[in-house]
Amino acid sequence: MKKKSFFAVTMSITLLLTLLAGCSDPGAGSGGGPSGGDSAGQTGGEASRLKVAWICDGVLTDGGWNTNGYEGMQKLAEEYDLEVSYQENVPQTDVGDVLRNYASEGYDMVLSNEQYHCEPMVEVAADFPNVTFGCVNAYVSAENMIAFSGTLWQHNYLAGVMSGMVTKSNKLGLITFSTDSDSALTYLSSFRAGAQSVNPDIEVVHVATGSFSDLAAGKEMATSLIDQGCDVVYCNSGDCNATVMELCIERGVYTISAIVDRNGMSDEYVLGSTVNLPSTQLRMMVEGKLSGTHTGNVTPIVGGIEDGIEAFLVNESLQDKLDASVFEAIDEATAEIIAGNVTVELP
């Protein structure tokens, strides 16, 4: 299988940032107020330290989505000498107040790791035109708000292709937080479409944990799927992800990681990892602000595997354990997606 190097992914992000320069409002970020001062990395006079606030709806130690976002912000803070404030466990009912407080306190950027924070963020952003806001995987945006999103289907489609190639029972299991949200249905549609593109007889059994942190529920769902004959189980439900993978490995069943790369958990039973890292989007936001090339976009900008925003990372340890046709199918599907020849019916 052809490997996409870190350099290639980095170049994709760099090219996307360059293209975004043409999408920015030329007047955004100029004038008085917090965002009107010098930013870190600027030349000509003493540069002020960029103040950035970052919030999430869960805990920093979830080992996945929020951990990746938090660690990404820590790296950015060190790399660009940012002054960063972090706040975890922000409930949806408090998002507007938390964002407003940060903006009122003189922060240059106010960022969220949670896509469902984008609606209250748009409302708050209207009252603080000199502050740059940003939301990961946002589906609405504003003139002074940076909004990126992964397609949320391309990497899942590829995971489905690989699962469809390796299954012997023709039955795959998918675990998400719910079974009726748009994101869950997107995961289901794309995973199933990928699998059925190489194996029309595939059935996907979809169940929900109802919680991002109920590990017992995750284990119960995984056990049920395996007992029903699913020989590949894919979980995207927060803290439950690693627990489900551990159970699958114990039971000798193929599994797939969501959000972060957990391929190292097993060189035999982890097929790969669907990666949609918030840290990638956060870096694009901060670097766009620092360079002045991007401080807002009214319409969220969607990027996929070609842009490096999301990816399906095949477990390289399986290269000599699975038939070459498995990896050829993934390569072919990847090329077709990039060429725009793959469509998936989404909610």
What do the predicted segments below correspond to?
Residues 13-16:
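Hydrophobic alpha-helical membrane-embedded or membrane-associated segments
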Residues 1-11:
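Bacterial N-terminal signal peptides that target proteins for export
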Residues 18-22:
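C-terminal motif of bacterial Sec signal peptides marking the signal peptidase cleavage site
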Residues 23-347:
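A residue-level marker of the well-folded mature domains of exported/periplasmic proteins
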